[in-house]
Amino acid sequence: MNKFIFKKPISSLEDRIKKTPKDNPKRGHWTNERGLSMYVPVDSQTEIIALLKTFNLKGINYIEAMADFRNCSLNTVYLEHMSILRYINFSECDRLCADHWNTINYLNCSTWTRSKVRKYRKSHSLSWHERNDRTTCDLVPTKINAFFLHLGGIAECKYAYKYINK
């Protein structure tokens, strides 16, 4: 039995679309409808374009106004209890990542710890992206996570908290 519950977003599609990037001649454009297609950076966004190219990507797809970072994720972990506090989530993600990397001998190392993952994450400019399902977290380049605006997992947890405490 799967102990993880992948929850539908509590936020509305409209709320999520409001948090996605707008078409902007200095930033990027949508390939189709905002929040329901790919957001592509303009040519002058050379740093983001270079990062995307390392993953063979031209932009980031949004599914129902949720950024889909799976194609630029170095690792994916699943939290039993996502928090509204990012540092709590990141600490647990680092621990789970260490467990996984030890099993696959990532970078020829089988002595990963939460602390080592945290140091690696910081030295390689990586962040955990909390998905809207309030369970899944992807390890992605921080600049990609920041550039492709979105309403993410912590916001969903805050929506859930408000809903429960009504």
Task: Describe the residue ranges of each PLM region.
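Nuclease and nuclease-like effector domains acting on nucleic acids or nucleotide cofactors
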Residues: 1-127, 131-166
